Structures are given as C-alpha cells and as structure tokens.
C-alpha cells in the first residue's frame, strides 16, 4: 500500500509540473501594443477598400504580395 501511494504522489507531481510547463505565460498588454493592433486592423480595412474597381484576381495577387512582404521583413503573422 505504501509503495502504491508513493508512486501515485510522484505521478501527480510529475503531471502537475508538466501542465505548468505547458501553459503559456500571459503577456502584458501595453498601450503601445494596443495602438499597434488598432493600426493593423485599420490598415486591413484600407487594403480591402483599395481593391475597389479592379478584378478579384488582381486584388488577390496584391493582398498576397503585401502579406508575403510583411512576413519576410517583419515576421508578423497575420491571420
């Protein structure tokens, strides 16, 4: 019985440390990061509006080019 209890407690400790290590630490949001996210959202709206009057394929090509350039130079991942 004592051996089972010891193994059970060790397993619980191991599982608790693994779940703690797997959690992402919350990042602190500052006013600057909030402003940047608002600018990105506004920038997306401007890009969508700038595709008026051109074909759907041309608009898709332009958006892809902008996203690839952003990825290459800034490494920011946009969903």
UniProtKB/Swiss-Prot annotation:
Compartments (UniProt record): Secreted
Entry keywords, A to Z: Developmental protein, Differentiation, Growth factor, Secreted, Signal, Sulfation
Transmembrane segments: none
GO biological process, one term: cell differentiation
Domain of life, per lineage: Eukaryota
Sequence positions bearing Sulfotyrosine: 71, 73
Tissue distribution: Expressed in roots, mature leaves, stems, flowers and siliques. Most abundant in vascular bundles.
This protein's record includes keyword Secreted: yes
Reported induction: Up-regulated by wounding.
Molecular-function GO terms, alphabetical: growth factor activity
Keyword Coiled coil: no
Signal peptide segment: 1-21
InterPro entries, sorted: Phytosulfokine
GO cellular component: extracellular matrix; extracellular region; Golgi apparatus
Residues cleaved off as propeptide: 22-70, 76-79
PTM section of the record: Sulfation is important for activity and for the binding to a putative membrane receptor. PSK-beta is an enzymatic derivative of PSK-alpha.
Function: Promotes plant cell differentiation, organogenesis and somatic embryogenesis as well as cell proliferation.
Family from the record: Belongs to the phytosulfokine family.
Protein name per its UniProtKB record: Phytosulfokines 3
Name of encoding gene: PSK3
